[in-house]
């Protein structure tokens, strides 16, 4: 097991449902520490840059529109195997396929409005964390 950090975003649909606290409880109950957090309303430019890896995909425009539709909660999670733990907590991208008890099964409405984002690998996590948080604003506890 490795101590890792991962980026998590609670997307506009889940923020609008007022379930930030319930999602944070799941992180903490799984042994993940929230070592940085902020609320933001992403600009189109930031959303396009953050999701640039998907720029050629057919869903890119809809993804950007959704991510700028309301505020998001962005956090860095730290813990043993944080990336995998967070991905297990989130569940499948499509909430209809997500296991019962996962964040997406419980709070997401569709494959587009799917409540949360999480880094998928250590290198992705490093890039995504640096995008939203200068290193001096992330604190181990």
From Swiss-Prot:
Q: Which reaction does it catalyse?
A: a 2'-deoxyribonucleoside 5'-diphosphate + ATP = a 2'-deoxyribonucleoside 5'-triphosphate + ADP; a ribonucleoside 5'-diphosphate + ATP = a ribonucleoside 5'-triphosphate + ADP
Q: Where in the cell is it found?
A: Cytoplasm
Q: Which residues form the active site?
A: 117 (pros-phosphohistidine intermediate)
Please name one Pfam family that this protein belongs to. Answer: NDK
Its keywords, alphabetically, are:
ATP-binding, Cytoplasm, Kinase, Magnesium, Metal-binding, Nucleotide metabolism, Nucleotide-binding, Phosphoprotein, Transferase
Which parts of the sequence bind ATP? 11, 59, 87, 93, 104, 114
According to its UniProt entry, the protein's GO biological process terms are: CTP biosynthetic process; GTP biosynthetic process; UTP biosynthetic process
Gene Ontology annotations for the cellular component aspect, listed alphabetically: cytoplasm
Record text on subunit structure and interactions:
Homotetramer.
Q: Describe its function.
A: Major role in the synthesis of nucleoside triphosphates other than ATP. The ATP gamma phosphate is transferred to the NDP beta phosphate via a ping-pong mechanism, using a phosphorylated active-site intermediate.
Instruction: Name the chain's protein.
Output: Nucleoside diphosphate kinase
From which organism does this entry originate?
A: Burkholderia thailandensis (strain ATCC 700388 / DSM 13276 / CCUG 48851 / CIP 106301 / E264)
